[in-house]
Amino acid sequence: MPRSFLVKTHSSHRVPNYRRLETQREINGACSACGGLVVPLLPRDKEAPSVPGDLPQPWDRSSAVACISLPLLPRIEEALGASGLDALEVSEVDPRASRAAIVPLKDSLNHLNLPPLLVLPTRWSPTLGPDRHGAPEKLLGAERMPRAPGGFECFHCHKPYHTLAGLARHRQLHCHLQVGRVFTCKYCDKEYTSLGALKMHIRTHTLPCTCKICGKAFSRPWLLQGHVRTHTGEKPYACSHCSRAFADRSNLRAHLQTHSDAKKYRCRRCTKTFSRMSLLARHEESGCCPGP
């Protein structure tokens, strides 16, 4: 047999196995490019995973260090130091984030040309009074309504209000001067400037809350709850001054005015005063000053 058949020839068209070349390199040798010392990433007894889908295990600080050419560090620091950057910091990263061994370089934020941070506008409290320091002239809202001397003022009709809730209720229900879309009720001719206010008004026509005992309908669930208590006899709201109890909280508040010393309603014919408007009306209907 000719000797040429026994000699192994290397083909220039064959792709070399870089994984085998990587594992067969010298453990402690010099880099052919820069002459620096090459330190292995893993010890000799721990080989790299052979399956492409497997990820390398986390590093062991006692046995593994970053594979980096030592003479290159002074050159990198010298090149970056000329640009005004601070000293570099080498930190470990999770090897699962990337297959290759990466050494991130982190510099100081003082030398980066980053845009300034966005400053969000401050939302002022609507309870700021005109006598408090730093009170804004305008509030953050749909139209940034200015502060009136007595509180809040409507932009369109210039009607003042003491609270922001009162102004919002006025703009939704009563103010027809503001420019914008108007929502009209399909059951009556009332108009509203917000869809939410219109939906609350439509409930007065549809009456979706119905009593299962008598069939009476209500527009609000709490009105139905107070009505059901008239069937069950439940009266959870008791007066702290007497032994009376009520099924609804509003009736209790009206009753508490009878215990108050301040009588706000006065009869125009006599000097008698009453704590509630209904009591005054009953007094006038009965005839407080009968004729001779």
Curated annotation (Swiss-Prot):
SUPFAM superfamilies given in the database record: beta-beta-alpha zinc fingers (SSF57667)
One Pfam entry name: zf-C2H2
Localization: Nucleus
SMART domains, alphabetized: ZnF_C2H2 (SM00355)
One term under GO cellular component: nucleus
Zn-finger (C2H2-type) residues: 152-174, 183-205, 209-231, 237-259, 265-287
GO biological process, one term: regulation of DNA-templated transcription
InterPro entries the UniProt entry points to: Cu_oxidase_Cu_BS (IPR002355), Snail/Krueppel_Znf (IPR050527), Znf_C2H2_sf (IPR036236), Znf_C2H2_type (IPR013087)
Location of the region described as SNAG domain in the Swiss-Prot/TrEMBL record: 1-20
Family that this chain belongs to: Belongs to the snail C2H2-type zinc-finger protein family.
Domain notes: Binds E-box via C2H2-type zinc finger domain.
Record's protein name: Zinc finger protein SNAI3
The organism of origin for this protein: Homo sapiens (Human)
